[in-house]
Regions:
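Active-site-adjacent structural elements in enzyme catalytic cores
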Residues: 1-211
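A short, structured active-site edge motif that brings together acidic residues
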Residues: 54, 250-254, 320-324
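Conserved active-site segments centered on acidic
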Residues: 204-290, 353-357
Length: 357
């Protein structure tokens, strides 16, 4: 791997494996190396290459301001078969530009964006981590040909044009990485690949689900107070959370759906600035469970109901209060409802410390 890193540093082209296809890399801050890569690929001179990094945190060197959705997708999808085109309004603020000078802007950035890939392959990770300079890469084939999935395919395409080809065996996936462009409205898929549109939506959102029996008392209170707490932390209105990819829901394991929240619950959450007016009870189902990233149940019985519906739900389902149940205030006094709301509110504050939004 040291040889490959040295060759890249010297401006040579090096082929290496990723989890999807074999790539051919070049030093990104060298106009000569980029020109050679474009010639070998037979690529349009105006078409940019994707930057390749050895670790997810390296993206901060190139993208100075990451949106919440961008941070979320980096945390969940990298390393992995996803190339992300980030908007960069001011490349001059990027650490790499401060390090190498403004002349690298035209080499790394294209029309206010930069495409970045963080491969999930040990060879790629080690190679990229050893090179102190920015590295771009593209599939190791000439334009119009199929990307190679093994070293023989690389040599059949590029033998004599590259300084080194590193053999990492056959690639794990048969398809290419997905290419997605992030924007203010979410994302746009530029190339279909291993990561589906459905997976992308999951990567970009956080879904919290609270479960009780009838979805008229405990779980609606939890939903309303959780939504209010997150909105306050985010500096937005509760009904704007969906625009930020944050969804807080509740459901009842024994609910037929359709009913409003109980009067006691509506009144109790007002003490915390939350609003339950307009709540409509929902029945717990597999779709809600599968969509959720975090499921908090009021009792062990509710937790068992979740597991019964989706046996492989894993550790994303937990009791809201670890080790004990939250008693049902249904039919009780206003004091019973307020006591329950206080208990749930305190538990939510602790649980939110565990959740990265």
């Amino acid at each position: 791997m040291a040889k490959g890193a040295a060759l890249l540093t010297a401006g040579e082209l090096v082929a290496f494996p990723t989890e999807t296809v074999y790539g051919v890399a070049a030093r990104a801050d060298s106009a000569e190396a980029i020109a050679t890569l474009k010639r070998v690929k037979g690529r349009d001179a105006a078409k940019p290459f994707s930057l390749h990094i050895g670790a997810p945190e390296d993206v901060h060197r190139y993208v100075p301001e990451l949106s919440q959705i961008a941070r979320r997708i980096i945390r969940r999808a990298w390393p992995g078969p996803l190339s992300v085109v980030f908007p960069v309004a001011s490349p001059k603020k990027a650490t790499v530009v401060k390090e190498l000078g403004p002349e690298v802007i035209d080499l790394l950035y294209h029309e206010g964006t930069i495409g970045v890939r963080c491969p999930d392959h040990l060879v790629a990770t080690e190679l990229l981590s050893r090179v102190p300079h920015p590295v771009v890469a593209a599939s190791a084939n000439r334009a119009g040909q199929s990307p190679p999935r093994d070293i023989d395919g690389v040599l059949a395409e590029l033998d004599g044009e590259i300084a080194l080809a590193i053999d990492g065996g056959a690639t794990h996936f048969e398809g290419p990485s997905t290419v997605v462009r992030l924007n203010n409205d979410g994302f746009e898929i530029l190339r279909e690949g291993v990561v589906s549109s459905r997976m992308l939506k999951r990567y970009m959102t956080v879904n919290i689900l609270f479960v009780c029996s009838g979805n008229t008392c405990r779980s609606p209170m939890a939903e309303a107070m959780c939504r209010h707490a997150i909105a306050k932390e985010q500096g937005c209105a509760a009904d704007e959370l969906a625009d930020r990819g944050i969804f807080v829901r509740s459901a009842g394991a024994s609910s037929f759906g359709g009913g409003p929240a109980s009067g006691g619950a509506v009144q109790a959450v007002k003490e915390f600035g939350a609003d339950l007016n307009g709540h409509c009870a929902k029945s717990l189902d597999q779709a809600l469970i599968n969509t959720a990233d975090h499921i908090f149940c009021m009792t062990s019985g509710h937790r068992q109901a979740v597991v019964s519906m989706v046996p492989d739900v894993g550790d994303k389902v937990q009791l809201l209060i670890e080790g004990r149940d939250v008693n049902d205030p249904f039919g009780g006094s206003a004091e019973d409802y307020q006591r329950c709301a206080n208990e749930i509110h305190a538990a939510i504050q602790e649980r939110l410390k565990e959740i990265t939004l």
